[in-house]
Regions:
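Hydrophobic core of alpha-helical transmembrane segments in multi-pass integral membrane proteins
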Residues: 11-20, 62-77, 88-99, 110-123, ...
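Transmembrane helix interruption/hinge and helix-loop junction motifs
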Residues: 21-29, 76-83, 122-130, 285-294
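Hydrophobic core segments of alpha-helical transmembrane domains in multi-pass membrane proteins
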Residues: 29-39, 84-94, 130-142, 191, ...
Length: 329
């Protein structure tokens, strides 16, 4: 009964996120990223830390923190060409930590991952960067993995409401790409364009992904417009923005709906104070200057993505187990 209520709440949150994204996708994204994003990073990292980041050994998470530190160094010294390799190594290295207990096997696995990563970084740099620097920390994190968490919950409970939640999640996502952009009410000001500038490449690359599937209208848009026109004013650019805004908004709301997971009442006063102070400063910086807010929260944003990798892997393993269990019955 409690699980059904949670699923129902999440269905309502999906529909609400979609409804707002249809009309004001740019404003919605910028708002939730600045206001809900920092609180999400802080509370999720706090929750993951209490569960040892779902790793098998007590100090395994130092591996992830080491690569978070390297990513910070690449950002400070303008060495972002190494970012995809570092994220790739952290992603598959986290998987190796879950699978191997032996220190020797872990070391050999890490060497193998680094070698493969360096080869991909050298010979397939464009696509390698696209996947591991752009899509994995953004749309894969907020949409694909959120969808997998919903699927795992539905498989575990086998409830009709759980199945309904995954159907609604997919339906909302598809609907946002199909509903006419003529009803868009976003006010595209110079300030909005400037605030969104750092995210613009995500929209462009996602449009290119859809172009790969040979949508004639998208091909025409890409060929005949500049980047700002494509992202902020074209029909499919607006539809892609709706999808991104929905994915991020629901990702955050889904997390905050899990009050039994966050357990505010069990969090120490000092931790709560630290969380709210950092959150308040972050929102204030975003309000003052959006780009300053992004720079301030870069480390926290990328850290929460990387620290969730073991949980992402564990969820995929659990989904496989659930499917295998149910098909064998």
């Amino acid at each position: 009964m409690i699980r059904n209520n949670i699923d129902l709440v999440n269905i309502v949150l999906m529909v609400l996120s979609m409804a707002v994204a249809v009309f004001i996708p740019f404003e919605l994204f910028l708002f939730v990223y600045a206001v809900l994003g920092p609180m999400h990073y802080l509370t999720e990292i706090n929750w993951l830390h209490g569960r040892n980041y779902f790793l098998t050994r007590k100090n395994d998470y130092f591996f992830i923190f080491f690569f978070i530190g390297l990513l910070l160094v690449t950002s400070i010294f303008q060495l972002k060409g190494y970012s995809p390799l570092l994220i790739f190594t952290t992603f598959f290295g986290s998987l190796a930590l879950l699978f191997f207990e032996s220190g020797t096997k872990r070391f050999l696995a890490l060497i193998g991952i680094l070698v493969v990563g360096m080869l991909l970084n050298t010979f397939c740099f464009y696509h390698f960067r696209l996947v591991f620097s752009m899509f994995l920390p953004s749309i894969v994190h907020v949409f694909i993995f959120t969808g997998l968490f919903i699927l795992l919950g539905a498989l575990k409970t086998r409830s009709k409401m759980g199945i309904a939640s995954i159907v609604v999640f997919i339906s909302c996502s598809v609907a946002l790409l199909l509903i006419s952009s003529n009803i868009n009410q976003s006010s595209i000001s110079a300030n909005l364009i400037d605030s969104y500038r750092i995210f613009r490449n995500l929209n462009i690359k996602m449009i290119e992904v859809f172009q790969f599937f040979h949508f004639p209208e998208i091909k025409e848009n890409i060929g005949n417009t500049n980047d700002n026109q494509l992202v902020f004013f074209s029909d499919f650019g607006i539809k892609i923005m709706r999808f991104i805004a929905f994915a991020y908004t629901y990702h955050y709301l889904n997390w905050f709906s899990k009050t039994s997971v966050i357990q505010w009442h069990k969090t120490s006063t000092m931790k709560l104070l630290a969380i709210f102070v950092i959150w308040f400063v972050s929102v204030a910086l975003y309000t003052y200057n959006y780009k300053v807010g992004l720079q301030w929260l870069y480390l926290l944003s990328i850290a929460h993505v990387l620290l969730e990798f073991p949980l992402n892997h564990k969820s995929l393993i659990d989904i496989r187990k659930q499917l295998k269990s149910q098909t064998s019955q």
